[in-house]
A protein has these predicted regions:
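Extended, charged/polar low-complexity intrinsically disordered regions
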Residues: 1-48, 65
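Conserved NTP-binding/hydrolysis core of motor NTPases
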Residues: 66-167
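N-terminal pre-Walker A segment at the start of P-loop NTPase domains
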Residues: 46-73
Length: 167
């Protein structure tokens, strides 16, 4: 709740002033994960930069609906605040593990990854409304499923604005 400066998840109020030891533990997890990419092949430094950029978007994504609403209200471009993030890469590259870690760090809960069949305009609409701004994580998205539905999902620049959907 932006006005009362309180955050709740599944009806439970979250502590917005976490214990410094927990913060250090979370940072240690992130550093350990990003360092583990050193054993991968290819452009490791670019992969680390990409994962770091995605991580920052992921944590900020909770605020994107509100930022989009305020941008629209004040005649700014809503596409500056994307509500869709995509990680693409080779199989067994650690993407699913990365998403599980991010959702655990963000919500202090294990949030299941969605199936490729959830990636359709109608399913995504229902999931978005129910997830209160928490990112949807679709695991191993099938290329045909992506090709058939991505345009309507990714290019939906006005989603949630008219409904004042701000989490």
């Amino acid at each position: 709740d932006y006005e009362t400066e309180k955050l709740s998840f599944n009806g439970r109020e979250c502590n917005l002033n976490p214990d410094p030891a927990q913060i250090r533990n979370d940072i240690s997890c992130l550093v350990s994960y990003l360092s583990s990419l050193n054993s991968f092949y290819g452009d490791v430094q670019q992969a680390q930069r990409d994962y770091y950029a995605f991580m920052n978007w992921y944590f900020a994504s909770l605020f994107m609906p509100y930022l989009r609403y305020m941008a629209n209200k004040n005649s700014y471009e809503v596409t500056l605040f994307p509500v869709v993030g995509i990680i693409y890469g080779e199989s067994n590259g650690g993407k699913s593990t990365f998403l599980r870690m991010l959702s655990k760090l963000m919500c202090n809960a294990k949030i299941p990854l969605n199936a490729t069949s959830d990636f359709s305009a109608s399913n995504i609409e229902k999931l978005r409304c129910g997830c209160e701004g928490v990112p949807l994580n679709i695991d191993d998205l099938d290329k045909d499923q992506f090709r058939n539905h991505s345009g309507r999902i990714i290019k939906d620049d006005v989603w949630g604005i008219a409904e004042h959907f701000i989490n």
